[in-house]
Structures are given as structure tokens and as C-alpha cells.
């Protein structure tokens, strides 16, 4: 199959779903590229959109089109298990960091946040070794990893592996300050640039 990918939000931040789809299709012998609306010829095109404020792609492709992502207000479509748990194709964006979720969901029910509606309560997603590949740095997209025993176990594993990480959604400052074990654990982590804390409130 000839597969085209469209990152509707642009290429400023790697789209994790597209990297996983690319890895899966390449593993099955398919050709994969970012879709070219003028010269490309495809059997299927995947369009992924994270942000609702991003205008939709208006390009015309005369093939099967799959649109998904929170940007389409699609909170039910998920990747098949065999795609969800594959090591992403980091060559798609030419990045030198791994990207992924250790956990999904959140224990909080902040009324302004889409995470509880989309992902539910916190649960394990993937161990770090599942998506790190050959990279020595990882950008982790968890929403509240410190609220998960599995998440804390994976941070311990990250320390043992000696890789540098960035929890780019921020770590819950309240949980860290209330638990000396968490503070000690975070002190042992190698950070890509700096540690990010978050303390979301309505104010």
C-alpha cells in the first residue's frame, strides 16, 4: 500500500499517532510519506489533528481518507493495540528524542480539561522501554504521572537507564511537595533542560 500522512497542525511538534502509523505500515512493507496533494498517489491518507483551533486540511486526495484526533472532537477513535504499542517511527520527523505516554488519564476532574472526558481516570499506558528505541532522551506527554504507582515505577526505570527526559505537560507540584519519596525520585532524574511543574487552578 501507498500511505500518505497529513499532520494537520503542522510540523512544529511531532504527531505521535502518525509516527506510530508510519512504523506499523513500514513494518508491513508499505511505503509511507507525508502526503503531497499535487503529485502524490496513495491508497490511504491519514489526517491527524490535535487542536480544535487548527483549520482542517482542504487538500483533495482521491483515496480512502482517515481523519482522527482530538482536533476533530473525536474522543473515541483509538489506534489498534498493535499500532498503539509499536515503537514510533522517529525518522518521520527526524527527531532525536523518543515520544510517548507512560500513563494515560488523570485523577483530577478539572472542569476545563478534556483529559477526563477523553481518557478517563489514570491508568498505565506503556513502559518506557516500549517506545524509547535507540534514543537516549525522551519527551513524555503524561498528564499526571505522579498520581500513578506505575508511573513512579517507570520513573525509577528511567533513572536506572540513565536517559534524560522532559515531562512537557508539567508535573503536579502539589503531589511532589507532599511526598518526600517523589521529591527524592525527581532529584535523581536527568532532565533534558529543566524540570517542569504545573499547578492548575481555575484562577
Feature-to-residue mapping (PLM):
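Core AdoMet radical
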Residues: 5, 10, 46-50, 114-203
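Generic, ordered loop/turn and secondary-structure boundary motif
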Residues: 17, 107, 146-147
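Short, aromatic/basic amphipathic alpha-helical patches
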Residues: 18-22, 56-62, 77-79, 153-158, ...
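Short glycine/proline-enriched coil/turn segments at helix->beta-strand junctions
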Residues: 27-30, 37-43, 59-66, 95-97, ...
Amino acid at each position: 500500500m501507498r500511505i500518505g500522512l497529513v499532520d494537520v497542525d503542522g510540523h512544529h511538534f511531532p504527531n505521535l499517532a502518525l509516527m506510530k502509523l508510519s512504523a506499523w505500515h513500514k513494518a508491513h512493507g508499505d511505503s509511507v510519506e507525508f502526503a503531497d496533494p499535487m503529485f502524490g498517489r496513495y491508497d490511504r491518507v491519514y489526517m491527524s489533528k490535535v487542536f480544535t483551533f487548527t483549520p482542517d486540511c482542504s487538500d483533495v486526495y482521491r483515496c480512502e481518507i482517515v481523519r482522527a484526533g482530538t482536533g476533530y472532537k473525536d474522543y473515541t477513535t483509538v489506534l489498534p493495540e498493535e499500532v498503539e504499542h509499536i515503537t514510533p517511527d522517529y525518522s518521520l520527523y527526524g527527531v532525536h528524542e523518543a515520544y510517548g505516554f507512560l500513563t494515560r488519564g488523570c485523577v483530577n476532574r478539572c472542569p476545563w480539561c478534556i483529559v477526563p472526558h477523553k481518557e478517563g481516570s489514570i491508568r498505565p499506558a506503556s513502559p518506557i522501554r516500549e517506545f524509547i528505541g535507540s534514543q537516549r532522551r525522551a519527551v513524555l506527554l503524561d498528564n499526571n504521572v505522579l498520581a500513578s504507582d506505575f508511573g513512579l515505577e517507570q520513573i525509577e526505570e528511567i533513572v536506572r537507564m540513565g536517559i534524560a527526559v522532559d515531562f512537557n505537560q508539567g508535573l503536579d507540584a502539589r503531589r511532589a511537595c507532599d511526598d518526600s519519596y517523589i521529591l527524592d525520585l525527581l532529584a535523581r532524574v536527568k532532565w533534558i533542560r529543566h524540570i517542569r511543574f504545573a499547578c492548575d487552578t481555575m484562577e
